Each structure stands twice: as C-alpha cells, then as structure tokens.
Design a protein with these regions (language model features):
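Structural core segment of the AMP-binding/adenylate-forming
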Residues: 63-154, 264-266, 273-274
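Conserved AMP-binding/adenylate-forming core of the ANL superfamily
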Residues: 2-59, 76-81, 151-155, 192-195
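Conserved AMP-binding/adenylation subdomain of ANL enzymes
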Residues: 65, 198-216, 226-269, 282-285
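ATP-dependent adenylate-forming carboxylate-activation enzymes
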Residues: 48-49, 69-85, 97-100, 106, ...
Length: 355
C-alpha cells in the first residue's frame, strides 16, 4: 500500500502492505476514540511532516467519522494555530522531529507555539498527540507538557490488535478540511464531503493518471496540500495501488536521488510540479539517463509548465516513452478539472487540456 522512503539513504524503506495498513489504522482509531475521546463530527488538526504516520492518522480519523485538517509540515506554529482556532480543534496530532536536507529538525516546538497562540485566541487544545520519528526514542529538544502532551507510540501499546467498526457516513458528511495557502489573505477552510470527494479522487486517479492495482505510483507533492490528499492518499489507495511517500527534499544527498528511488521501487507513474521539474533540470539535467526506471505516465500539476521544460520532462525524465498529463484544478475542487487523457488526447507542451 505505502512505501515510506526516509530522507537518509542509509535508513531502510518502510514497505507497508494493505493488511499492515488496516491493522495500524484500526489500532490508531482505537487510541483516538478511547484515549483522546474523539467521536463522529469532531475536528482534529494534524501538523505532521511527510511520514507513513500521516496517512495512517488521516485514515484512522476518517474511520471514526472525525474531520481531519492537515497543516503543511513546513508551516509555523502560528499557521497551525490559525487553523486550530478556525476549525475549533481540541486535539492536535504532530511528530517530534523529521529530516530536511540531512538535518533532524525539532518539529515539536511548533506544537507548543500553536497551542499557546490558539489559547490566546480563545481555543484551548486539550491533548497533543506526538508520533516519534524513531519509535521508542524522543528526538526533539522541546520538552513535553505534563497533562497535555502524550507519545502516540507509547499509548498504542494499549491498543495492539484492536478492531474498530467504521462509522457509517452519509455522502455529504464532511471528510476533511483543507485550508488554502492564504496567498490572497486569511487562509480559507475548504470542506470536502465523503461520497463525492472519494468518487472524484478515485475516478480521476484511474482515468486521468491510469492508476491500477499493480502500479507503483509516486506523487512528489506534500500531503499537507490538496494534491497530496487526493493523489497520494485517497485516490491511489482506493485503487489498491502502491503509493510512495518520501520524507525529504528531492536533491538530497544529490540530484540523482529521485531517479534512484524510482529505480529501486520500480515506480512507473510519476507526479510532480513544474517548479520541481525546473529545479531537477537545473541541478541534474543528465541524471535521469543514469538510472534504469521506466515511467508509463507522468503528471504535472500546480502551475503552467513552459514548453522547453515540458520537452525535457518528456525526452529525458520520461525517456520519450511516458504519456504526460498536464492538469489544472483547485483546492476547492478536490481533483483535476482540466487535463488531457493518456493515450486518448494528443499532448501539447504547455497545454492543460485539448491540444
């Protein structure tokens, strides 16, 4: 189901099967229900970095009918506080630390900042649940707050083997909140429902991205954005594919890292943004040719892609074999609105739609 790739290359890749995912989601759901006291209709803010624990937590909350609101891991404690206050969350779920550019960053400090700022604005956080980057070891310098902060890995021991019946939801019941980036003012919370969103994320994953159960699919986006929700978690997993989650930056420790990951995991569907494509082209224009991978399909998303960048993406990254789908959509839509269809629509460099 999930291949979690740590940023440090010497650390092992965590291969999580669908059975293992089912077990871990159920155990986390039991903890969230019985320890955190969460129930259907509650809102919970997540401030997690790219990790296997992020989709596990999202799916556990969804199993309980609890509305999740994930904040991009790179955002500040204040940004998390704004979303805690707006959503009325009384539980925050985070991680102690994560790697970025080879450095282990203290992420726990942001939860303290978020809780303090939220309290100033009238929203008290009752519990902060903290996943450990290394199970059994606390990796942050920021101390825990007694009575409020709890280590998920420790508490999970009380729920091993637990099974939780999923909450039956109506199609229009909320599944999650996704806040816009706030580039045009205060971040706005977009609420996505259960039935329509899942149907659309699944349908576009299948027909636009050509995802099948045997595929290994890698979207380089962050789950903190709508692209990650729809096309790392909900879409690929609903189609029984294998979804790659990478912890760090694509050029660590060198520009060949993405293509080594693709080679080692047999990735055959690749999904990224023009900004990343431009960066990879600049720092390692000849790197893809050094690695033995084969993409059948490549997506570009998030912004227009210049024709010359598109051509490098097709010729060098795709090795003139992969179909490119250029897409346009919004946080509010939950899935692709404008795109070509692989193998059906002609491709045109820089065009997100019919050529």
């Amino acid at each position: 189901a999930i291949h979690f790739v740590p940023e440090l290359e010497e650390e092992r890749v965590d291969h999580i099967t669908y059975q293992e995912l089912y077990v871990r989601v159920n155990e986390m759901a039991a903890l969230l229900r019985d320890f955190a006291g969460l129930k259907r209709g509650d809102r919970v803010t997540l401030h997690l970095p790219m990790s296997a624990e992020l989709p596990i937590t999202m799916l556990a909350l969804a199993r309980l009918g609890v509305i999740h609101s994930q904040v991009f891991g790179g955002f500040s404690g204040k940004a998390a506080a704004d979303r805690i206050v707006d959503s009325g969350s009384r539980v925050l779920i985070t991680m102690d630390a994560y790697y970025r550019g080879g450095k282990l960053l203290d992420h726990k400090v942001k939860s303290n900042q978020a809780c303090d700022k939220a309290a100033e604005d009238g929203q008290k956080v009752d519990k902060v649940l903290i996943w450990q980057r290394y199970a059994g070891k606390y990796s942050a310098d920021t101390p825990l707050v007694d009575g409020r902060d709890f280590i998920v890995n420790d508490e999970l021991k009380n729920y091993y083997g637990a099974r939780i019946d999923p909450e039956w939801m109506n199609a229009e019941d909320p599944l999650f909140l996704m806040y816009t980036s706030g580039t045009t003012g205060k971040p706005k919370g977009c609420q996505h429902g259960t039935g329509g969103y899942l149907a659309y994320a699944t349908g576009t994953s299948k027909y636009v991205q050509d995802i099948h159960p045997e595929d290994v699919y890698w979207c380089m986006a962050d789950i903190g954005w709508i692209t990650g929700h729809s096309y790392i978690v909900y879409g690929p997993l609903s189609l029984c594919a294998s979804s790659v989650i990478y912890e760090g930056i694509p050029n660590y420790p060198d520009p060949g890292r993405p293509w080594r990951i693709a080679q080692n995991l047999d990735v055959n569907i690749f999904h990224t943004a023009p900004t990343a494509i431009r960066a990879l082209r600049k720092i390692g224009p000849d790197e893809p040719a050094k690695y033995n991978y084969k993409f059948k399909h490549m997506t570009t998303v998030g912004e227009p892609i210049e024709p010359e960048v598109w051509k490098w993406y097709y010729n060098v990254v795709g090795k003139k074999q992969a179909a490119i789908v250029d897409t346009w959509w919004q946080t509010e839509t939950g899935g692709f609105l404008c795109s070509t269809l692989p193998g059906i629509s002609p491709m045109k460099p820089g065009s997100a739609g019919m050529a």
